[in-house]
Amino acid sequence: MSKELMVSKIERGTVIDHIPAGRALAVLRVLGITGREGVRVALVMNVESKKLGRKDIVKIEGRELTPEEVNIISAVAPTATINIVRDYTVVRKFKVSPPEVVKGRFRCKNPTCITNAPREPVEPTFLLVRREPPLFVCTYCGRYHELGDLL
């Protein structure tokens, strides 16, 4: 295989590396990136990786992810590494970890939870109760959820 770059470097933005193979689209979904935002996104799937065997990579030009967005990625890509790029240089690099609080991103799986009532303006909120593997509890009904189950 050639050692050339498959996707060009980005001047400024975020590179999400070490995503398990086949999970890049799920990463975009949890970030709410649809392609209609006007942000340039590069997606590379199933490339060789010494660490994972195969991996996906997502590059988001012109946008640095918020800490909340970074940590919510752990729901679908727990091995992901985040690289913040400025002037074509990585200025920060870190691994994702489950957030302490997840608010308004997912629905509670309990059908009788008040957050699922059609006329109740209650935003679902989950608290982290265990890091490995991540386990959350709904603050309204007390139901436990693994992070991947919230998707």
Swiss-Prot record:
Q: Which cofactor does it need?
A: Zn(2+)
Q: Which InterPro entries match?
A: Asp_carbamoyltransf_reg_N, Asp_carbamoylTrfase_reg, Asp_carbamoyltrfase_reg_C, Asp_carbatrfase_reg_C_sf, Asp_carbatrfase_reg_N_sf
Q: Which terms are listed as keywords in the entry?
A: Metal-binding, Pyrimidine biosynthesis, Zinc
Domain of life, source organism: Archaea
Q: Which GO terms describe its cellular component?
A: aspartate carbamoyltransferase complex
For Zn(2+), which residues are the binding ones? Answer: C108, C113, C138, C141
Q: How is the cofactor bound?
A: Binds 1 zinc ion per subunit.
Any one biological process term the GO annotation gives: pyrimidine nucleotide biosynthetic process
Q: How does it assemble?
A: Contains catalytic and regulatory chains.
Q: What is this protein called?
A: Aspartate carbamoyltransferase regulatory chain
Q: Which organism is it from?
A: Pyrobaculum neutrophilum (strain DSM 2338 / JCM 9278 / NBRC 100436 / V24Sta) (Thermoproteus neutrophilus)
Q: Which gene encodes it?
A: pyrI
